[in-house]
């Protein structure tokens, strides 16, 4: 799934793919289905997505990902 119907912002396949990869990697890290589904809630604008960024050691590029969330989730 590359496009989430809950996202009402600009459709950008590259951004969706990048955000989706964070949730996929986070799921692979913890192997808990709830992590995968919760990470995608509210078009990635949630605390689990932020925690996944931290857990995947993406702290230095958090702003880039949050900007992507804002673009697709308006």
Curated annotation (Swiss-Prot):
SUPFAM superfamilies: Crustacean CHH/MIH/GIH neurohormone. Keywords: Amidation, Disulfide bond, Hormone, Neuropeptide, Pyrrolidone carboxylic acid, Secreted. It is found in: Secreted. The modification Valine amide is found at residue 72. GO terms for cellular component: extracellular region. The keyword Transcription regulation does not apply. The modification Pyrrolidone carboxylic acid is found at residue 1. It comes from the Eukaryota. Its main location: secreted. GO terms for molecular function: neuropeptide hormone activity. Inhibits Y-organs where molting hormone (ecdysteroid) is secreted. A molting cycle is initiated when MIH secretion diminishes or stops. This is Molt-inhibiting hormone.
